Every structure is written in C-alpha cells, then in structure tokens.
C-alpha cells in the first residue's frame, strides 16, 4: 500500500492536522493500492496562509524569472514522465500507451505553450498607440484555488498551475480525491524545480470539505474549477459572497454533424473512436452524432462496427484499447444511462448494459451505440461520461444546426463535410467554444472552454494566463 497522507504546504511535506484516511482504488481491479488524507479546515487554512504570505514577493518576480521556474518544472516533468504515465494509468484506468502519449503528453505540451505565451505577452502598453501617460498594466490577481478532476489529471493540473505560475499568482491545488496520485507526483516535481516556498501548495480533500473552504475563503482571489456543471454552480455560489474571479470548465454534450458530402466511413469511424477514447470520460467527447439522412443507414453500420472492434482491456497492457471507468459510482451512472436509452426506445446496435464478455471485475463497460435517438431522450440530453454514442438523422443543414444547439451545454462541436463554404457557414452558427472540422486537431496553446453551462473563461496559452490577471490603468506618468 502506497502511503501519501502528507500535504505539500509552504515548500514542505507536512502531516495532516485534521485529515481522515481515504483509500485510492485501482479501477481495473477494484482494490485499494494507496492511502491519502482528506484534509480539513486547519490544513486548508495553512495552505491558504502560506500562499497569501508568499504572494507579495512572488507577484513581483519578472516574467523572465517565472519562465525559468517553468523551464525547471518542465525538465522535471519530462525526466519523470514514465512515472507520471504509470501513476495516471493506475489511478484512473487510462491504458499505459495512451497515458504516456495523451494524458502525460498533455501536461508537457501545456508547459511548453505557457513558455511560448510568456515570451510574447505584453504586460504593459499605452491605452492607445502613441498616447503618453495613459498605461494599461497586467498584474497577478492574487491567491488562486485550483480544483481539478480525475478524467484528465495532468491536462487540467498543468493548465491551471502553469497559467497561475506564469501570471505571478500563488496557489492551492486540490486534485480529485479519486485520482490524486499523479498530483502528488506533480507536487514532487514542483519541489524539484525549486519554486519558492508557498508559491505552490497542495491539499487533498473532497469537494464538500476542502473544495468548499477554498471557494468561500476571503483570502482566495481566484477559483479555477474543472468538473461537473452541478459542482460548478455550487462553487460559484460559494464564491459569490466574497466576489471572487471564478473560472469554470464544466460539462458537455458535444454534437458531431456528418454531412453526406464527406467520406462517411472515415468520418463516422473517426467520430466513434473519439467518442470512445479515454473510455468516454472527456468533457469534449463527441457523443451526439447527427447524420444527413441519405447517409444515415451507412453511418449506423460503420459506428456499430467501430464499437464492436474497439477492444477493452487492462490499463497496464500496451495497445490501443480502452480501459475501465474511474469508479464504481461512474460505472453505475453509465449503466443506468445505457438502460435509460433502451427503456426510452433508442435502437441499440452495439454494446449495452453489463461488462464486456470475459470480464467480471473492474469498472469496465461495453462501447455502446444507439441509433434512432430523438432530441428529448436522456441519452441525448445528459452527459454520460462513458463510451456511449447516440445517433440520429437530419434532413437539412438548418435542422442539423438546430439539433446541435439544442443543449444546455456549449463546449465543443464537430463538423464533417467536403465543403469549406459549408464548414464556415455552419461553424458560425454553432453555439460552442471549440469547433473542429474533418478531424482537425487543435493547436497547442489554443483556448479551451465553452458557451452556456459548459463554463466561464478559457484555459490554455495566453488566454489561460489572462484568467489569473487583473488589468490596472495608470494615468499621469510621463517619460521613462
């Protein structure tokens, strides 16, 4: 049993003041493999105090100095990336190859993007070109509370920590208690990078405890949260009494619009695989596939075949399979939503309830495809967070756009078409923060975030840094 009960506060690993033991389970075996502490009020207060005391000095460092610390952190991260990949794979079930390339790789990519953003960031400038004595200045916003999820641990931790460090903020990180071990390892990397004591602090805990204290504490200036929309609403309410800056990256129910002027086999195969990737545990997963009616029957066959050919296996095995869901609670939720799809009359063409054949332990699920879904079905409305694809036809471009936008979410949307003109026209009408056309990837440092109940603010690159900055105007200083 791995023992990681201590918290990282003010540059040291310290024993909990009021922590309670919490077992971390391996989702592939359902067995505990590590123990952490869930911090309490005293632990959280200690971390906030350390960050508050250090802010006055850290916020006065130059961007060049902060860049050197980020470079040192990147070096430590790269040197220990094998450890990180194994840690993520064990705690949340990502297959080891995917954990190395995508999960661990995301953290490295974000650190590099923040370094590029720092090189080009304009920290002060005239309000208008050539206007003397009227200056705009960007300054660190203060002490940041960073609350991260379990599904993409380092993607989210580095998006928040890297941006806050670049901006000159100090911080308290609360990772998900379900998958905390990668964040413990990350804290070790921060220590190796030599950041001043108190700049980065980490306290494990649950949302109701540490999360609520951080969100409502008067010495926290910024809250950056990634998780469910329900939890994001609660955090916003908790932060309101002290009027904090709140950045939220929340749920999604992203549409994938497939027009008949594209390569249907390639587009549907790609879309289904993206839906199933990370066992469907991605907020931007393309879980609603809307297909032009003339191509619908072919698309359903392709999606069903893709699901049936998607292998499910242990996370510690090499290959391009998918692993288990992260927890029993997540498994039960996904099973219930698959059953809801069946009960409400959607046609199941692949997968279904229960574990895959030959697997009787671990929170593994069958890649599942529903055809003939309708807009009001639960599987078309609720974020499932499992490898479950819902498909339905459309007749016109206008109908496709209307169906795509018929959701309280607006994180991402996907377009498959052979026409650039159509792609631009449709993209302009989709109410989502990120649009990807014909499988195009997103450039490193692109802004990540969405419309409506998918959140507030953006992460990544220069936009992520700006979430941790205040803008100050200074009038009346002339000359150098």
Task: Annotate the PLM regions.
Residues 33-39, 54-60, 107, 146, ...:
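Short, well-ordered beta-strand elements within core beta-sheets of diverse protein domains
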Residues 123-266, 394:
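Rossmann-like NAD(P) dinucleotide-binding subdomain of oxidoreductase/dehydrogenase enzymes
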